[in-house]
A protein has these predicted regions:
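N-terminal Rossmann-fold NAD(P) dinucleotide-binding loop
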Residues: 13, 163-164, 520
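Rossmann-like dinucleotide-binding cores of NAD(P)H-dependent redox enzymes
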Residues: 60, 153-155, 161-219, 301-306, ...
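Glycine-rich dinucleotide-binding loop and its adjacent helix/turn
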Residues: 111-173, 208-209, 269-271, 490-494, ...
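FAD-site-proximal beta/loop scaffold in flavoenzymes
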Residues: 126-150, 227-229, 234-312, 407, ...
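Rhodanese-like catalytic fold shared by cysteine-dependent sulfurtransferases
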Residues: 419-430, 434-460, 465-471, 478-509, ...
Length: 680
């Protein structure tokens, strides 16, 4: 009887074992698992920590007994393979419970070791409570630490899948969270402008972000305080640290056995998952695979590909000619109320190739707008020029966002083009979609671009407009235009365009914009047929504003979060002899009021609070707050250089003060400079 040994369970190894038994009843199959669980839902671990998944047993997909009873497969948990003897086809195994070593022979060996969390040798790492998350015991350790130590603040190092899922689930437990990331964005597999929507969602839910600030060390003080020290030197006080920097392939067994290893440490396999030894196969996070589009080697630590690779190995050992054709990297992650999904190549990756490409953005609803609960989806499609072959897609939005990426992924698997997306037929009913689905819409837009019906410009091209003899027109309503636009734009509403053509210069290149791109498209068709050279801003002002925003500006828009307000006040506070000054400029209502309340909590009796705001609703908010709160005096309320400024102090107002009108102060620039007011 031929013997098959599988090292490692979870996704790839367990799938290979079960599939192999279904195909070959005559094999002796043994699974060796170092940990206490052979097949568990490691993707569910953050949700177990967040108590979304309440019972540990729900994470255990299969047990050794069930494997034996159902598949006649011998699963040995708590057994660590210490070495592979390729010549004699045997493995050395340590039984971790009784510390005995045994040797097992094989005819075929399948490696499914997975990947291990990256833990850099940070200075001071042994002085602070640091955790990684790979398995159920790791999760239990984190949960016990939170409960036993009444954790109030956690710092997550890294903003990838695990970092984001941990941030959400720690917030669900009432823990304040800060993500520290060395790059200028979270989710590095996405392009920056799409990641900005994630930044916004994180900030809105009270997760603080510290981007472009790599961690250099940790330390602890003699009072039990723990600190993360990033390159900026701005220490972060915290109660616990989660390392979510990424993973590296666990390859030490393969290396020691002399198997071929790739430049990034992955085990090299062929399209049938064979290693450099024909009797040894490998699957999962530890292997090097081919990118389906570029045919270049890569590593993709995702559960879906690992399961499929396990099936391929089983087929091959069973005598079938199955082949793994490459990976598209389709993925999805939940970030609070946002679904984030992607497939294929990002623009960042494409810039490293010689492929000629174009991109478009759309913002359709996830289902019919007249049906309650419709939510927008921002969808980016990247495609080859001039063929229209789909190269990648990224989307953020409400429910059903991942469905659109799944459809596009399917089209990509069959080398589909943007013209195929125009014609693709999808199910429709008002609760689930639209007659023109988001997938169709992005196909229409991309096809219009390739056919020359809608030349486009991009959010990052704005600085090139002047040099291109450009004339920028915002075709939204005057009200929308006043709220915000791109610098230098003139406002001609699309409904008035036909009557105001004389205002559009024919000797210039016309650049159009609207909120999401549709109205500007309609305007472009009018102008193009009148002989103008026109381009439309794909994705519209909505994308432009989000893509260009700094983290501080995004935080300002999301200023209702208590955690964001605390950090904002800390950074914007200035102490003078008489005042605590806080500049809450840029925070949207109720952000300035929250900043005021937070500042009053720590205001010394000897000082007054002076707070600046730009939100027009602040005046009414601060007046109402002072009127309802007897322990606070509103001393003055006025304007300084276009900003509202309120002065307050703690203490009960006298009847005379209550009856007296609030004094409105107006000051000149000269007076402000003399008094040394904060920079405005």
């Amino acid at each position: 009887m031929e013997k098959v040994i599988i090292i490692g369970g979870v996704a790839g190894g367990a799938s290979a074992a079960a599939r192999l038994r279904r195909l070959r009843e005559d094999l002796e199959i043994t699974v060796l698992e170092r940990g206490p669980f052979v097949s568990f839902a490691n993707c569910g671990l953050p949700y177990y920590i967040g108590r979304v998944i309440k019972e540990e047993r729900r994470l255990k997909l299969m047990t050794p007994r069930r494997f034996l009873n159902r598949f006649n497969i011998d699963v040995k948990i708590d057994h660590e393979v210490k070495g592979i003897d390729k010549t004699n086809k045997k493995v050395s195994v340590l039984d971790l419970k009784n510390e005995k070593t045994l040797e097992l022979k094989y005819d075929y060996l399948i490696l499914s070791p997975g990947a291990t969390p990256i833990v850099p040798p940070f200075e001071g790492i042994d002085e602070v409570p640091v955790f990684t998350i790979r398995n159920i015991p790791d999760s239990n350790n984190i949960m016990q630490h939170i409960e036993n130590n009444k954790i109030k603040h956690a710092t997550i190092i890294g903003g990838g899948f695990i970092g984001l899922e941990m941030a959400e689930n720690l917030r669900k437990r009432g823990v304040k969270v800060k993500i520290v990331e060395m790059l200028d964005q979270v989710m590095p597999a996405l392009d920056k402008e799409i990641a900005q929507f994630i930044h916004q969602e994180l900030l809105l839910n009270g997760v603080c972000l510290q981007l472009e600030d790599p961690v250099e060390s940790f330390n602890a003080d003699n009072k039990g305080g723990f600190y993360v020290v990033p390159r900026s030197g701005e220490k972060i006080k915290t109660d616990m640290i989660i390392l979510a920097i990424g993973v590296r392939p666990e390859n030490h067994l393969a290396k020691e056995a002399g198997l071929e290893i790739g430049p990034k440490g992955h085990i090299i396999v062929d399209e049938q998952m064979r290693t450099s030894d024909p009797s040894i196969f490998a699957v999962g996070d530890a292997i090097q695979v081919k990118n389906y589009i570029t045919k270049q080697s890569t590593g993709v630590p995702l559960a879906g590909p690992a399961n499929k690779q396990g099936r391929i190995v089983a087929d091959v050992i069973a005598g079938r000619n199955s082949k793994y054709k490459g990976v598209l990297g389709a993925s999805v992650v939940k970030v609070f109320d946002l679904t984030v999904a992607s497939v294929g190549l990002s623009e960042k990756e494409l810039k490293q190739t010689d492929m000629e490409y174009e991109k478009v953005y759309v913002h359709p609803n996830n289902h019919a707008g007249y049906y309650p609960g419709a939510e927008p989806i921002t969808l980016k499609l990247i495609f080859e020029k001039p063929s229209g072959r789909i190269l990648g897609a990224q989307a953020v939005g409400g429910s059903g966002t991942e469905k659109r990426i799944d459809v596009i992924s399917t089209a990509m698997k069959f080398n589909g083009t943007v013209f195929d997306l125009e014609e693709i037929e999808l199910t429709y009913a008002p609760p689930y979609g639209s007659a023109k689905d988001a997938v169709n819409m992005v196909g229409f837009v991309a096809s219009n671009v390739l056919r020359g019906d809608m030349p486009i410009w991009h959010w990052h091209d704005v600085d090139k407009i002047k040099g291109d003899n450009g004339y920028l027109i915002d075709v939204r309503t005057p009200g929308e235009f006043q709220v915000g636009t791109i610098e230098g734009a003139v406002n001609i509403n699309d409904l008035e365009l036909r009557k105001r053509l004389d205002e559009v210069p024919k000797d210039k290149n016309i650049y159009l914009l609207c909120e999401v791109g549709f109205r500007a498209y309609l305007a472009s068709r009018i102008l193009t047929q009148k002989g103008y050279n026109v381009k439309n801003l794909t994705g519209g002002y909505k994308l432009f504003k989000t893509a260009k925003a700094t983290t501080e500006e995004l935080a300002a828009e999301c200023g209702t979060s208590q955690e964001i307000i605390e950090e904002f006040v800390e950074k914007k506070r200035k102490i003078t002899d008489n005042y605590i000054e806080v500049d809450a400029s840029g925070l949207a209502c109720p952000g300035p009021l929250n900043a005021l309340i937070k500042s009053l909590e720590t205001l010394p009796e000897s000082k007054q609070l002076k707070i600046y705001a730009t939100d027009p609703g602040f005046k009414a908010s601060v007046e109402a707050y002072a009127e309802l709160n007897e322990a606070v005096k509103l001393l003055s309320l006025g304007k300084e250089e276009g900003k509202l400024v309120a002065k307050l102090q703690k203490g009960k107002s006298t009847p005379k003060e209550i009856e007296a009108p609030v004094k409105l102060e107006k000051k000149t620039r000269k007076q402000l400079r003399v008094q040394g007011a904060p920079a405005l």
